């Protein structure tokens, strides 16, 4: 059971600005009803000053989605579009005195809706790169651009964090490999001046990534698959799918990976399945 702050509960039970804004001239739609999360953000913006005079929302989702949308409207009313555009999903979460890690995607959805509304006001069309080469998660309709912004804005480094912040990979899990590849590419493009440990990444992260990459072809040959979720304090958490999920050989597969990791790192590593 997740622990919610009193402020989250307040904005859930008493949402601010949960209404349709008449004569809205900036509307942003994100998410999908079929995916279980959808948000429409409506703004009335002064055309001359670009000050947001009124904001309202309609959302379909969990309590955190309602609270995040409510908080967002409180944060942006009275500010110019330029000022509002600088608001991050972390500021939305902070305004609510925090959100559970598994619910951070709700604050990201609010930021994405604001981004879409500002583009709508300016007559611009956000690039929805949903062609086969860019759509990463079909279950939740999450594209590479969405993942890239979440990673860069929040310093994400693991598959588990991407799932929590975007919902990508939270369904059938078949896109985990695509997410890992996209994550690796995004991280590789970031400045290399920040040490891995300082960015929140475990010092053994790369060794674990390389080891799993070497073992995956053998696992896939037997109809299974493995994805890295996190590396924390010598504990490696992975997800198993396909024939590996719940099979009698699961413990042997984890022990095999554990042995390989200890050989590579020269220290004790515990491997567990999520």
From Swiss-Prot:
Top-rank taxon, per record: Bacteria
Any one biological process term the GO annotation gives: iron-sulfur cluster assembly
Organism: Klebsiella pneumoniae
Lineage: Bacteria, Pseudomonadati, Pseudomonadota, Gammaproteobacteria, Enterobacterales
Keywords linked to the UniProt accession: 2Fe-2S, Iron, Iron-sulfur, Metal-binding, Nitrogen fixation
Family: Belongs to the NifU family.
Gene Ontology terms, MF aspect: 2 iron, 2 sulfur cluster binding; iron ion binding
Keyword Cell inner membrane: no
CDD domains named in the record: IscU_like (cd06664), NifU_Fer2_BFD-like (cd19947)
Signal sequence, renumbered to the chain: none
Protein name in the entry: Nitrogen fixation protein NifU
Pfam name, any one: NifU
Cofactor binding description: Binds 1 [2Fe-2S] cluster per subunit.
Role according to the record: May be involved in the formation or repair of [Fe-S] clusters present in iron-sulfur proteins.
Record's keyword annotation contains Metal-binding: yes
Cofactors, names only: [2Fe-2S] cluster
Chain sites annotated for binding [2Fe-2S] cluster: 137, 139, 172, 175
